[in-house]
């Protein structure tokens, strides 16, 4: 829907503080097909999560990068003609990417894009918990609630919250209980249970921080009810209503605000998003520490599609149809 593969797109031209990346693998997100189908202006390149090798280095980026370095990160796919990840080449600001160690595959590296960046913004910037710095923080007397912990975003939220020293409470389907515990959850509850709020509040009555990694239907209300005794903030990944409780606020967060530019969806009538300097600073800090912190923030499970653009299109169709579970879809470019 809404897009096509083009083979006559020029290689992006970089500025002095950018690097040119030859893409080796990408990861797929629901935001990709939403941009393709509805949001993106004509001529923009879709795709956010990438891994690859540095092909060219801007004059001001030479102290950090050299040609041939392995690199990964996230870009604002679906807004620009030369920055989307679903391309053979993309350009990115040199401090908004991370160096991939030799023991991490391209497909695993590609998963540290939108899902991981969103988790960093929510856990470290908005909720103010300690950033990763190569070692786990000392335990703190604080518990955080993460709704939908088995999602790609949820698994990164769990890991970053644990790395910050928190006790992590989450929800999932029973078949995913072991998965979320493997990634660090201290307690997990069946989100389908009609008494899930009562069960959580009984065991953890004093939470004030929540993140809704589903953000549809009743999920945000569940988060609010879990923290309403003490009051606090629920962070959502999509707009999902307004809080019914005066001591609970909702905060919509999107990974794109970490990329340092204002943007608007469906102009002139769509919502505008202003520059958030603290978000960009957070991403620089996160990606700088990530290569030394991969024993703490581990890659999430992946499902590999066929290589190349056909694999991307088929994967987006699966996401569009709600046919993906158990891992993040990834696609390789070129040889395995």
Regions inferred by a protein language model and the residue ranges of each:
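Terminal helix/beta-alpha structural elements that buttress the NAD(P)+-binding lobe
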Residues: 1-15, 22-57, 62-336
């Amino acid at each position: 829907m809404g897009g096509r593969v083009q083979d006559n797109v020029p290689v992006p031209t970089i500025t002095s503080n950018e690097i040119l990346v030859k893409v080796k693998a990408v990861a797929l997100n629901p935001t990709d097909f939403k941009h393709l189908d509805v949001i993106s202006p004509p001529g923009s390149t879709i795709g956010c999560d990438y891994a690859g090798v540095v092909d060219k280095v801007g004059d001001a980026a030479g102290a950090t990068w050299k040609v041939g370095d392995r690199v990964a990160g996230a870009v604002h796919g679906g807004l620009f003609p030369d920055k989307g990840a679903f391309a053979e080449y993309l350009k990115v600001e040199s401090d908004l990417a991370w160096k991939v160690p030799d023991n991490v595959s391209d497909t695993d590296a590609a998963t540290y894009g939108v899902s991981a960046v969103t988790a960093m913004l929510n856990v470290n910037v908005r909720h103010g918990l300690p950033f990763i710095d190569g070692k786990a923080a000392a335990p703190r007397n604080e518990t955080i609630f993460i709704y939908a912990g088995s999602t790609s975003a949820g698994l990164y939220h769990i890991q970053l919250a644990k790395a910050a020293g928190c006790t992590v409470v989450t929800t999932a389907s029973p078949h995913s209980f072991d998965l979320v515990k493997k990634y660090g959850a201290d307690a997990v509850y069946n989100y389908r249970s009609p008494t899930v709020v009562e069960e959580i509040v009984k065991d953890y009555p004093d939470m004030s921080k929540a993140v809704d990694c589903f953000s549809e239907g009743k999920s945000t209300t569940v988060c609010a009810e879990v923290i309403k005794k003490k009051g606090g903030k629920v962070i959502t990944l999509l707009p999902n209503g307004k809080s019914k409780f005066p001591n609970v606020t909702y905060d919509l967060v999107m990974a794109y605000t970490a990329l340092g530019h204002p943007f608007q969806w469906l102009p002139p009538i769509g919502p505008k998003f202003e520059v958030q300097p603290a978000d960009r600073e957070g991403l620089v800090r996160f990606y700088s520490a990530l290569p030394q912190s991969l024993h703490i923030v581990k890659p999430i499970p992946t499902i590999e599609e066929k290589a190349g653009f056909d694999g991307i299109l088929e994967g987006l169709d699966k996401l569009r149809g709600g046919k993906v579970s158990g891992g993040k879809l990834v696609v390789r470019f070129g040889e395995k």
